[in-house]
Every structure is written in C-alpha cells, then in structure tokens.
C-alpha cells in the first residue's frame, strides 16, 4: 500500500541549512510540528533550548525541561518540544526571566536577540492578506498564523479597516491587542527576512511593481547609505522614524 501523508521523521542532512545541528554526527533531527511557522522558516523549540540557549546537553534533557513548562513562546507556556519558533516570536525562560526575540540575521538566518522586560509582551506581525467574513467584518491574516478580526459598522463603507497587506501591526502577546500600526511604503524602516540580504535593515526608497509579491522589487538604503534590492516578499517593516523593537548592535543607527 502506498504511504499516505508526509514523513514523520526528518533526516539531519535534509534539515534546513541554518539549523545549528551536527549533520554528520547524528542521522535524525527533530521535525517541527505543523504550526504558526513553516519548517523552512522556523526552529523546533528543542533546538533552541539545547543548541542555542545551551540549557541542556542532550535531547532527553531538553524534552524534560520543556515538558515541565520552563519556556514560554509569545507569552504561552509550550510543552511540545517540536513546537516551531519563527520570526519575531518572543521566547521567555520562566525561571530566569530572560526574554529573547527571534530575529532574521545575516548568514545564520536566525538570531535570538535579548530584549528588555518592557518589550517582552509586544510583537510585530506582518499582514499577509485580508478576508471578508460573515457580517462584512474584515479578518487580518498575519505572518505567524494569527488572525485578528476588525469589526465594521457598515460593510459598504468599512472606515474601520485602515490596514493594508504588507503593513505591520504591533500587538500584545498573548492578548493580541493592537498597540500600533506601521504602514508599508517609502520612508518606512524594514528588516529583511529572507534571501541573500537576510537580516539587513534599511529605509524603503522605492518599490518597482511586478507580477505578484515575489516579483515586486524593493530598493532600500541601510544605515551606511548603501543601496540594496530585494523581493517584496522578504520585506518586513518595523518602524517609521525608528524601529519599534530593539535590534542587534550595528543593525541600525
């Protein structure tokens, strides 16, 4: 009989290149569970605990710590060691109070960046698309799988819907209360979340529209005045006058 569904296991050699694992030492790697982020843009919680934070030496130790509820992701205790952690997620070590944000980073693709206490319950999320639901209300579909409902009084004139695709919302986690709205456009500060310019931060200078998001070209200028280009699909706006989140030293002015 033919196999139905996907593989439940993942070979280390087939894991994404940016995963911090010893591919030639171990045959198998932890396969992320389906969740808010795709496997090619996330790290399983076990790898973060063991390989990045160094709180465990073995997978068994990491699974034990996770199952005991020592780690929160976006304000929620996660006990599944396969839970996928991706861009902009906030990881908290419950016992120490340490908080980190998962940021895109050059070459390594991901970096756990320490953040201050006041930033720990805030998260920027990108609007991927919008849908109209029953009653004429607008549902915002975000990059991490979340949905936020914008209620409108008159579906024929939805003045409450001021949001556009590719805009960024600053929300609380886990409450999902909207605290800020950053519009995508020229003059906005953005961080690149994919491609060869991953992790670079710059100001949007121009947008050359193409067929679809991936073929639309965005030109940005970094803090040193250097211009670079990338696909619109990789652009994640994080501020107007200044970034709304803390960044690694040297990433911005």
UniProtKB/Swiss-Prot annotation:
CDD domains associated with the record: KOW_RPS4 (cd06087), S4 (cd00165)
S4 RNA-binding domain: residues covered: 43-114
Protein's UniProt keywords contain Ribonucleoprotein: yes
UniProt xrefs under SUPFAM superfamilies: Alpha-L RNA-binding motif
Biological processes per GO annotation: translation
Pfam families: Ribosomal_S4e, RS4NT, S4
CC annotations in GO: cytosolic small ribosomal subunit
Gene Ontology molecular function, alphabetical: rRNA binding; structural constituent of ribosome
Keywords, ordered alphabetically: Ribonucleoprotein, Ribosomal protein, RNA-binding, rRNA-binding
Matching InterPro entries: Rib_uL2_dom2, Ribosomal_eS4, Ribosomal_eS4_central_region, Ribosomal_eS4_central_sf, Ribosomal_eS4_KOW, Ribosomal_eS4_N, S4_RNA-bd, S4_RNA-bd_sf
HAMAP family the record matches: Ribosomal_eS4 (MF_00485)
Entries under PANTHER family matching the protein: 30S/40S RIBOSOMAL PROTEIN S4 (PTHR11581), SMALL RIBOSOMAL SUBUNIT PROTEIN ES4 (PTHR11581:SF0)
Record-stated family: Belongs to the eukaryotic ribosomal protein eS4 family.
Protein name (Swiss-Prot/TrEMBL): Small ribosomal subunit protein eS4
Organism: Aeropyrum pernix (strain ATCC 700893 / DSM 11879 / JCM 9820 / NBRC 100138 / K1)
Gene for this chain: rps4e
